[in-house]
Amino acid sequence: MQPRKPQQIARELALLSLSQLPVNPKKLDTLLDDQLVSKLVLGAVRTLTSEVQDTLNNAAGELQRSNDRLLSSQTRASDLNSARTMLQEAIACTQTAINQLGTAVDFPELIQLANQDKGVRNYAKELVITVNENRHIIDELLSTALVDWQVTRLAQLDRDILQIAVAEMKFLGVPDSIAINEAVELAKRYSGDDGHRFINGVLRRVTEQKKTA
């Protein structure tokens, strides 16, 4: 695996800490470097912990429903198929949780680079501030790009990935193709099985709408 660039590390820190940091940009902008790093890392840990716990709870729920269906059925084909589907959902949820836990091995690198590389922490801060300052505009762009869906109904990490990508494209001058590719890579690490395809599709529609606006 190739070493990740400072901006890639910054995006990951911003993604994992976005929902945990102060919404008021002024509060974040006044933090000293060591305070900023501490808040970024703590926010990342809390987000990842919450995501893994929720995913495992979903897996446990699907397993229980599958088990209940098997115990109460009379081995009808429809019941067996339903139980099989629930079991597959549980396996998928468990795999997602395992993948999310696997990213924890990168935390020492995140912490070290955030401490040593000013560019990492500054870009992470810029991303969080830009999203919070322009959240209404960003969410409007996403709402028009979502098909039969609402921004508020998206999974937290999916929503944050999309918001960061749109912030980069619209406000930070990042080329659309780079912002989309980086968002897709984040989705592969932190979203569900088809999350990266969903993220890619939404962001492609955002760029198409920008061209016709």
From Swiss-Prot:
GO terms for biological process: DNA-templated transcription termination; transcription antitermination. GO terms for cellular component: cytosol. Keywords: RNA-binding, Transcription, Transcription antitermination, Transcription regulation. One of its GO terms (molecular function) is RNA binding. Involved in transcription antitermination. Required for transcription of ribosomal RNA (rRNA) genes. Binds specifically to the boxA antiterminator sequence of the ribosomal RNA (rrn) operons. PANTHER family: ANTITERMINATION NUSB DOMAIN-CONTAINING PROTEIN (PTHR11078:SF3), N UTILIZATION SUBSTANCE PROTEIN B-RELATED (PTHR11078). Belongs to the NusB family. This is Transcription antitermination protein NusB.
